[in-house]
Amino acid sequence: MKGTIRKLPLILLAAGAVLFAAGICVAAEEPFARFIKPVTNPVYFDEAQNVSYVHVVNAYQDLPKRISTKLGRVPLDGHLNLTAVRATYAFNEKFSLIAAKDGYIDFKPEHTLEHDSGWGDIAAGFKYALYYCPQDEFIVSGKLLFEFAQGSREVFQGNGDGNAAPSVTFLKGYDKWQFMGTLGMIIPFNAKQESMEIYQSYHVSYALTPRFFPLLELNHFCVARQADREELVASIAEFEGGDVINLGSQHGIDHRNFVTVAAGFRYRIFEKAGVFKNLDFGFAYELPLTNPNDGLMDNRYTADLVLHF
């Protein structure tokens, strides 16, 4: 099973290649059509423009060999895998509805904790362009997500009463460059069960060709207010879980900052094929800049397909 998961980026790429063989490539005519979606922090880091698409994403994350707890450095190792299908529907260039988090999680540590799998919490919301200037290739958008606590507790979902996640995102194009960033908060409705966090993500990419975009991304999560959940992991962990998991840690402020950097690319497989506008494949390799023991990530491989319509 682990081998199959590791091969998923190749499977997605092979599927894209098949679609590419039947694709029709024409010049993009819509404003901002040449810009790409970020790859990492898939739950909270979205593009600023309002566009319609289906997004299939797989994130395979190696867990640290040891994690920081009130009992000392506890062995963990193993991996976490998230597979999700996300969607956005744009009513116009100013407004869209978003299904941002709905997927399946495999949590398979080698030590201390049990292997488990289950459904992630569902998050949905909307996005509105506060400033929209195609001639300057500049957008500023506001987004509001609501997460519902219906997921599987076995994989650290379903705790609390959900949360609200407001954010502001900008996009700026310059020649062949794309710059993008977001700043937001995760505000739990039950402060005892989930931590409040502030996050920021940044993206820079360059159109090496009209189809190929090397990229760099940076993500930062900061615990603004720790929770007080009594579950075993939450009661001893000295950190929070990052973008996918909110542990509700009683000691999240001990190591409140979690920062990662990622390098990767997007490849535009086709443009304008029938009712579809374009299909993009993305891949990124991500590493923590903070101590890996103070989180749940030793490294992460993210691969996705984005089908615009």
Show where each model-derived region lies.
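Transmembrane beta-barrel domains of Gram-negative outer membranes and organellar outer membranes
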Residues: A27-F189, Y199-F309
